[in-house]
Structures are given as structure tokens and as C-alpha cells.
Amino acid sequence: MKQITTWLAAGIFFLAILAGEQATAQKKRTTGSGFSAATRPRNLSDSALLDLVQKQTFRYFWDFAHPVSGLARERSNNSFSYGDEVVTTGGTGFGVMAVIVASERKWITRDSAARFLLKMVKFLSKADSYHGVFPHWLNGATGKTIPFSRKDDGADLVETSYLFQGLLCAAQYFDADNDTETSLRNRIGWLWNEIEWNWFTRDGREVLYWHWSPNNGWAMNHPIRGYNECLITYVLAAAAGDRYGVSPAVYHGGWAQSDNFKNGKDFYGIPLPLGFDYGGPLFFSHYSFLGLDPSGLKDRYADYWEQNRNQTLINREHCVRNPGHFKGYGPNCWGLTARDRKSTRLNSSH
């Protein structure tokens, strides 16, 4: 435990300083002062360490939110030269979840949380969207699309799924009979009801497509197939109802039809029902399950509790055995996923 405390404390220290410095520089709300080397907590219990990680995660989305829209920044503006205005729709969905947690744990008042999210939703109602689907990046001041790449300058169905995974949870959590929470629920409902999931089957094909743009059409040509972090996109598309929802055939004929969908092999003696050999990055077990409970969730392909548990156990065992002899890997330092490195933007950890 001592080793994991050291590794996590170092990560928390960096994130806390980042959140504190960015919040100060942007002159936005804060939930308290940032960390310093002199005052950072030491010798924390597991429970206290977990509390600290959770609170510092929330602070990124609260202290460093865009001052106009409230949406989440795309990583660090200073480190990655994105400029002051780039916000991310999918990351905002994660931030909505963090705000709900902060309200429940009394780090902020329920009313301030609801008002913060209402500002977000009002902004989104005027921002660019395409058949109800938002782009990956928006300008946080104007709501205009910022291209993610040359041809990716329109709708992003997967990022929109992450956004609404958070917003739908907010609509359930903020259930009070007052003007702020009623308006929040109604506005989330209006946005949700305008998402044309079935339009992204590209004229009725049995698969969902990730991107579409008015400038480039379907040029990205990226069908969403499993198994990866995109399960929630199909779940929400199926849940959308008769107007814009998709049929089970789209799930079975699209998502489940891939060379990397079924696995069935054992790794380190642990069976893996779905996905790439060794399971792939751990965010496959995270992103879709922020709002989707895997407990008891089964279909003809997998028990999703078993899938997530076993992928995680394989990930840990790989670090314990450390066949690549990477420095630091071991029983108290594991959890391989995507991460940032300043020199090359985004990398997958080994």
C-alpha cells in the first residue's frame, strides 16, 4: 500500500497544482486552494486517498470549466496549445458526473451544482449540432464547431453519447420541484429528443457511423464496431424510442460484427469474453459504464460484469508479470490506459 500511495500521491499532486493554477489564471470559481509541496497530505488511509482523488478530479471540471459555457476544457490549454476556447463534449459528460458526485458529497451545494449544469445546457441548446448530434470540440464562448481533424468538422456520435450519459444522469438526480431543477430536466429532455440516432445508420445500414459533417458528408467513413469504449452509443441509440431509435438488428449486425468483438481466450489464466487480446486499454471498462451498470447486464455475447472484471484482472496481472520490463510496473502500479504526454499529445500506455 505504501508504494501505491506514493505513486498516486505524485499524480494527485500534479493534478491538484494543474487545477489550482489553471483556476487562478482563468479567474474562475474555486473549491479551495491548490496543493503545494509543503502542505500536501501524507500517510493517507486508503479511504482518505480515494476521497482526495475524487475531489481533485471534480475540481478540474469545476475550477477549470470554461467561464462562458461551463463546458470541460480539452486537456490543458497551456500544455497542448489548444487556446482558451476549446471545450470537449464527451469530456463534459464526464464532468457532469463529477458535479453530481460533488453535490451528493456536499463539496458544493445542490443549488450551485444545478445552476452550473443549467448554464451548460442553455449553452448547448444554442451551440452547433448536426441532426441533434454535437461535434467533438466546440468553441466554449461561441458554440461554434472547432474541427477535431481536417474532415472531422461535424457530428461526433460517440462523444455525444458520453455527453448524454452524464446529462441523463443529471436529469434523474436533480428531481426537485423548483424552477432551476425543473428547467434543467426539461432542457436536457429537449436536447435528448432531438438526437437522430437512426440517421447515423447512413440510409438504413445495420451499423452506426461515428461522424458526419455538412462539409465532408460521410468522408470519415468510420462504422462503430466493437468491442471497445463505444457500447454506450448503441445502448442510448436503442433506448431513444420510435422516433429516432435504432432496431436490435443495428446492434447485432453492426456493433457485434467485428474481427475484434468476440475473444474467448484466456490470458494469464483469466478468460476474456470480448475484445482485443489482453483486453486493450482499461478505458474500455470505464467510459460506457459511468452510467450503465454492468451488474447483471448480459446479452448473447457476454456477462458485462465478468467482462469488465476480467479485463481489469488481466490488466493488473500483465503489470505484475511485466513482460516488457517497464520501470515501476507491479502489483501496486497498474491500470494501463490512454494518457497524455506533452511531447506527442495522446499515447496509449504500453
Task: Identify the function of each model-found stretch.
Residues 25-348:
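Ser/Thr/Asn(+Pro)-rich, low-complexity disordered segments
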